[in-house]
Amino acid sequence: MIETDRDKDNPLHISLFPPHSNTAGAYLEFSFLLNASLDIFDLRARDKNRVDQDLGLLHAVDERLSVWGWETGTGTRFAIVLDMYGRAGGEGDASGLGVKEGELRPAFKALQTAYICLLRNPFYVPDEHTVAAGGAQIKAKGFIKEVQRIGLAWKPGVTVV
């Protein structure tokens, strides 16, 4: 699952991927999971020693679900929830989930690039997605398609998405 959040913890876009994309209640379940990770996002973002946008592992929910975070210089947040069900972790993995610290960096960079391309679109109005304007989610087909491509293309060990 991939989530984009820009302002006041208002999710701009949430994408679910198989096997959860067709599961009843999965959207709500992952929304709760992301909401539980927002405080950790805030704590990591306030770290004055942070020199990178990659916030790393935010929350290991159990042995299979983990939430990873990335925050841009403008405060846009990206979260990826990994479900490692059925995947074997390699030896020496820092997280114990088969994903090493920094392995999601290509996916986050691709998401940030997709979001920048969305902002460059003259027909996209970012202010209509604020909480004051009703908190609408991003409906741009190009952005949604690119997020889906990124989510399906990324696997542990992939260096370019």
Language model features with spans:
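Fungi-biased regulatory scaffold/adaptor regions
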Residues: 1-14
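Acidic, low-complexity cytosolic segments
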Residues: 14-161
